[in-house]
Regions:
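Processing junctions and N-termini across compartments
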Residues: 26, 45, 86, 123-126
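Extended aliphatic helical segments
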Residues: 9-10, 28-31, 96, 120, ...
């Protein structure tokens, strides 16, 4: 998936009049899968515009969407407090939950499994942030 994102940016730089205007690489990409219902989605980090109700309810236990966590957040030494809903894992989980809604499947955050997050620019692996590990039980 990181390779697809890099190729998309290269094409947009070559042909700036087609499609979206020039943009830089997203920071992080992740893949989410629901084995129980055979659904896989991939996404990258950016601000979240709309959120599945199940994920939104869980996010709101820790603060408001788009703002750093303010409530019930476990403290890890030196870990940054990213805005809730900006992470690639949360976007991928949102896509899977929306796909399961369309199939009328029962949903649970415990049924979602995640790949290791990767930096898009060079595909280095990255540990999930504190917010993702708190909100999404199986985030790595």
């Amino acid at each position: 998936y990181c390779g697809q994102l890099r190729n998309k940016v290269v094409l947009q730089r070559k042909f700036p009049k087609q499609g979206n205007p020039y943009w830089d690489y997203p920071t992080v990409a992740s893949v989410c899968q629901s084995d129980r219902f055979n659904c896989t989605c991939q996404n990258h980090s950016r601000p979240m515009r709309s959120c599945n109700n199940l994920l939104l309810h869980e996010i709101q236990n820790y603060g408001n969407l788009g703002e750093p966590a303010t409530r019930n957040r476990p403290l890890y030494n030196g870990s940054p407090n990213y805005p809730l809903g900006n992470c690639a894992e949360q976007h991928a989980a949102n896509d899977v939950l929306n796909a399961l809604d369309k199939k009328n499947c029962p949903k649970s955050l415990n049924d979602l499994y995640f790949s290791r997050a990767r930096y898009v620019r060079d595909s280095r692996e990255l540990d999930a942030c504190v917010n993702c590990r708190t909100i999404l039980p199986n985030a790595q």
